[in-house]
Amino acid sequence: MEKFKAAMLLAGTGDALGYKNFSWVFCASGVKIQEELKQLGGLENLVLSIDGWPVSNNTLMHIATAESLVSDYWSIEDLYRDMVKRYIDVVDKLQGRRPDPATIEGCAHLKPDNYLLAWHTPFNEKGSGFGAATKAMCIGMRYWKPGRLETLIEVSIESGRMTHNHPTGFLGSLCTALFTSYAIQEKPLAQWGREMLKLLPMAEEYCKKTIRHMAEYQEHWFYFEAKWQFYLEEREIAEENENKPKFPDKYDAEERDKAYKTWSSEGRGGRRGHDAPMIAYDALLGAGGDWKELCNRAMFHGGEGGATGSIAGCLYGLLYGISKVPKSLYQQLEMKERLENLGEKLYHLATMEK
């Protein structure tokens, strides 16, 4: 249970660190961010509180997903209706947090008063952003057992489509949910990427059954898959017998920014649903259990550090717990009790199931 609590809490910590009250989100240089961090006294001397280090809409939407998952819904459709209401409620309260525009636009299409079609939204050409991925980690925590795989796939896709109805967006949601389930199942880290790719045909079959006009999704579907295949080949972990990721000899903040740009679709690492989980995953592969190194790789770079940080923080919590993380980074964190409470509830619900 402690790791579930750590996962929810460190997702918030990673978000707050990478976001830095919006000031680091638009900084395109990881080197500059790390210089500023030194001037602040270094990671271990930061005190994250609501005043200078609030969480962003990533954490608020993740909380909304988790609260739906621990509610007393009586069917999957009922769960979706609850998610719709909670997402709209969050968006209504986002003044001052400068939310992801795709999330705002996606929520505008939700219909909370329409019992049958509440969560059905149209295909959105602009819905490829990271916001679906950063609110879905808890789905993999709720349905982590192998016997719940179909539910995990369905719920992560539908939750993603509510706000980001574009394959690059909602497959990011599937990806982060799968990764959290793999962390709890203790699958070797180097296998996660290829295990996820193996399940994309299953996800596609589900979408073909539930999406009327699948044709407009198809070309974007292959983009997500191709980007991940390219990444796994670059790290030399694409094949079954490849379990030792290969990193460049020089992979400092400047080189990482360059790499993250090549994986992106618009020159800013972590802005989309494919590369936000990718950067978090790459950071975990490179950092292992070293929290400070994870932060350097996933939170402090010239891309969307709040998004990649929240995913990486959550996965780190499930893999390693919270003991190596400085207490000043979470003791005064905004919504700390709420996050820990949700971690506890997710644990109890997931373990109660046979």
From Swiss-Prot:
Q: What is this protein called?
A: Inactive ADP-ribosyltransferase arh2
A GO CC annotation given for this chain? sarcomere
The answer to whether the entry has keyword Cytoplasm is: yes
Please indicate which superkingdom the organism of origin belongs to: Eukaryota
GO MF: ADP-ribosylarginine hydrolase activity; magnesium ion binding
* Phenotype caused by lack of the gene: Morpholino knockdown results in defective embryonic cardiogenesis with hearts forming small ventricles that do not beat. Defective endocardial maturation with endocardial cells showing a rounded morphology and no clear lumen forming in the heart. Myofibril assembly is disrupted in the developing ventricle, preventing ventricle outgrowth.
The places in or outside the cell where this protein is found are: Cytoplasm, Myofibril, Sarcomere
Any idea what job this protein has?
Required for myofibril assembly and outgrowth of the cardiac chambers in the developing heart. Appears to be catalytically inactive, showing no activity against O-acetyl-ADP-ribose.
- Tell me the organism: Xenopus laevis (African clawed frog)
Give GO terms for biological process: cardiac chamber ballooning; cardiac myofibril assembly; protein de-ADP-ribosylation
Q: Which family does it belong to?
A: Belongs to the ADP-ribosylglycohydrolase family.
* Key words of the record: Cytoplasm
In which tissues has expression of this protein been reported? Expressed in heart (at protein level). A short form is detected in both heart and tadpole tail (at protein level).
Annotated membrane-spanning segments are: none
